[in-house]
Amino acid sequence: DIGTTKIVAMVGEKNQFNKIKVLGVGKSQSLGVHRGVVNNITQTIQSIKIAIDEAQAKSRIEIKDVAVGIAGQHIRSLQHSDYITRENPDEVINNDDIDKLIDQVYKLVMLPGEEIIHVLPQDFKVDGQSEIKEPIGMYGSRLEANFHIVVGQVSSIRNIGKCIKSSGLQMGDITLEPLASSDAVLSFEEKDAGVALIDIGGGTTDVAIFKDGIIKHTA
């Protein structure tokens, strides 16, 4: 978690209940980040190393690969609808069909200097039948979906990647921080009923809004 005021590294493992057991946490003062954006590579690398070293010492586990949270003023979101025409409508819709549709959305052209971070399906439509949450197993030739798309500046994402790599680590998944926070603190019932998660940080405040178990808005 590369924040404006502090950098936090956490080591955890899944237990038999599919919950994360925290094995070690490291923290350091963040000196090279402003409003969620890296503005000093050298200072950020130093802060990352301090947090990682502390997390390794407490967990007694060597850290090589990390998942990174991303936020900041360069992040924006938008709504988009798209569809595919299935090649085999006599077969039921499967994960490959959904992946094909999502991959198609990832190819959308954003503004210069931007790239897509997340493509999040909200609901589906099969041959005109709308408001479908789970289309897998259904028959249909035209598969449509509404998407919530999260976009960030390429330069900001690359700067984070450089800091991670220069700290001797490999960067895995990048996740929008309010989405990661929502998975950690919100229940399915809360997301289904409707809830707004507000993450107040040292330099930015992030929001994620859910309704009917679907991500509706991020900011």
Predicted regions and their residues:
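A structural feature that tracks compact, well-ordered secondary-structure segments
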Residues: D206-A208
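A cytosolic small-molecule/anion-sensing beta-strand core signal
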Residues: K211
